Amino acid sequence: MSKQPENSFSSDKFFPIKQKLALEAVALVEPGMCVGLGSGSTAREFILALGDRVRTERLVITAVASSRISQLLAEAVGIPLLDHSLLQDVDLVVDGADEVDPCLRMIKGGGGALFREKILLQSGKRNVILVDERKLVPTLGKFSLPIEIAPFGCSSVQRILNKQGYFGEWRETSAGERFITDNGNYIYDVRTPDSYANPEEDMIRLLQIRGIIDVGFVIAKAEVWVGYADGSIVRKKEHNEY
């Protein structure tokens, strides 16, 4: 069984880079905006920075959180949240990613919120993905590919995945229990194959399997902001070799 990735936050040596990326991104927020809040350690820093602006500048905005964890943090720092069932257009979505290839295709879902994160990105007028340089890869697949699967018939879905050449493990919590997403589903972390030259094809193939809710590939219009150890930030908007 695969374990749910643990948050390290300030113990991460790239923590200052995540903070800098978050501060750069929060400057994009303008009064009256609806802001999509991603999940994960970098999105956490963005939420904290946005909360500071709401508090110190009396910034009037609304936000939609992609996970229960992000929702609780946003509430704690005073960010007004929109009922997610009322979600329509989102002016700005800020999130992170687990991997980004040279075509800006991504793998997301290390925190288990991939389905809601992708709905936010689909609704976003402007999507900004914040990553540090470790997340840049020549080909997707170094990080496991999360697949969100409905509990009903999940063993059958796993059997079909294995027959098609996708092998992995069911994600567990640190307590050794089956990880359950905010939507009440499971996560199957695919380890093999470990390289996806054409993720669009894999995504189409996987989504045809009944019981699969969503796949961790993200092929969406988004800006990717990359933070480097030297303190620089590079903003990528289209195919760009590293």
Curated annotation (Swiss-Prot):
A Pfam family reported for this protein in Swiss-Prot or TrEMBL: Rib_5-P_isom_A
GO biological process: pentose-phosphate shunt, non-oxidative branch
Enzyme class of the recorded protein, top EC level: isomerase
The enzyme's E.C. designation: 5.3.1.6
Assembly mode: Homodimer.
An MF annotation (GO) of this entry: ribose-5-phosphate isomerase activity
Gene3D superfamilies: 3.30.70.260, 3.40.50.1360
Full protein name: Ribose-5-phosphate isomerase A
Functional pathway: Carbohydrate degradation; pentose phosphate pathway; D-ribose 5-phosphate from D-ribulose 5-phosphate (non-oxidative stage): step 1/1
Residues reported in the UniProt entry to bind substrate: S39, G40, S41, T42, D95, G96, A97, D98, K108, G109, G110, G111, K135
Lineage: Bacteria, Pseudomonadati, Chlamydiota, Chlamydiia, Chlamydiales
Its biological purpose: Catalyzes the reversible conversion of ribose-5-phosphate to ribulose 5-phosphate.
Residues annotated as catalytic: E117 (proton acceptor)
Keywords: Isomerase
Gene name linked to the record: rpiA
Family statement: Belongs to the ribose 5-phosphate isomerase family.
Membrane spanning residue stretches: none
Signal peptide positions (record): none
Keyword Oxidoreductase applies: no
Reaction(s) the record says it catalyses: aldehydo-D-ribose 5-phosphate = D-ribulose 5-phosphate
